[in-house]
């Protein structure tokens, strides 16, 4: 939940002991990464600057995320993957916005290009998937909906942090013996518009196959639920279009 336990709240644990955050005063950290601010907002801006992503381009990406999400909702694409909670049976955050409305927002940092419009939504939610071994599949006579061909976990410089999908993709393709041309659909979390935009720039993967039903800019990514939420949406969309990977 992002409304009850805000992101970064765990970093306050040491304040009573005189530590404002886990990094300040750490000689090992400073010697390795310097004294740059550790912030997703800062990382998003660094990515936008490095890949020369203009504010207008990011706002256009954000607008398309909302359009795709609203279209998916209207067509009932999410209905199979959502378990209603009392009367709540659809995402509340996608909105009919415009480039003009987004242009009115102030940047998060003076002189920057990252605004609330190109950032993921603050939302609450939960998700889950059931992953079993081949042995359990046979033992319990289960019918699988998908098979994981390869799973990678790759880290990135913590100052940049949000660029990790780029090396993770390269590593996964290498280890699996696959090419991006083999992939039907991809979900790259839209923490900020600059994240999937930089990924698409580096991989040359088409936007038409990326976050096809909108992403976190429109739908949010509740803390602790993002991975399984994206996997669930990806699985349902692959089944809907008859895709394989």
Language-model segments: which ranges?
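Short acidic, glycine/serine/threonine-rich loops at helix termini
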Residues: 4-12, 142, 159-161, 222-223
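Flexible glycine-/small-residue-enriched beta->alpha junction loops
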Residues: 1-46
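Active-site-proximal alpha-helical scaffold in enzymes
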Residues: 1, 48-77, 129-135, 222-243
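Active-site pocket-lining segment
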Residues: 42-45, 78, 149-218
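N-terminal extracellular/periplasmic Venus flytrap/periplasmic-binding protein-like
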Residues: 57-139, 202, 207-209
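Beta-strand segments within the central parallel beta-sheet cores of soluble alpha/beta enzyme folds
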Residues: 1, 57-64, 82-86, 142-153, ...
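Conserved catalytic cysteine-centered active-site region
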Residues: 1, 34-40, 96-121, 202-229, ...
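Condensing-enzyme catalytic core mediating Claisen C-C bond formation in acyl metabolism
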Residues: 49, 100-163, 167, 171-174, ...
């Amino acid at each position: 939940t992002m409304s009850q336990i805000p992101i970064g709240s765990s970093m306050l644990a040491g304040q009573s002991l005189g530590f404002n955050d886990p990094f300040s005063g750490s000689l090992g950290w400073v010697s390795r990464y310097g004294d740059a601010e550790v912030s997703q907002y800062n990382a998003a801006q660094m990515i936008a600057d490095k890949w020369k992503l203009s504010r207008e381009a990011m706002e256009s990406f954000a607008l398309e995320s909302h359009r795709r999400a609203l279209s998916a909702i209207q067509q009932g694409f999410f209905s199979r993957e959502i378990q209603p909670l009392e009367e709540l049976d659809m995402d509340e955050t996608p909105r009919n916005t415009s480039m003009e409305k987004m242009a009115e927002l102030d940047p998060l940092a003076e002189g920057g290009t990252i605004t609330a419009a190109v950032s993921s939504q603050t939302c609450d939610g939960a998700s889950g998937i059931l992953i079993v071994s081949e042995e359990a599949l046979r033992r319990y006579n289960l019918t699988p909906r998908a098979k994981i061909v390869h799973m990678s976990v790759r880290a990135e410089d913590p100052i940049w942090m949000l660029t990790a999908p780029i090396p993770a993709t390269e590593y996964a393709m290498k280890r699996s013996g696959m090419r991006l041309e083999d992939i039907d659909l991809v979900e790259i979390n839209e923490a900020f518009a600059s994240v999937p935009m930089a990924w698409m720039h580096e991989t040359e993967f088409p936007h038409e196959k990326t976050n096809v039903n909108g992403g976190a800019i429109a739908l949010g990514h509740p803390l602790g639920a993002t991975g399984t939420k994206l996997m669930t949406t990806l699985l349902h969309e692959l089944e809907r279009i008859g895709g394989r990977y």
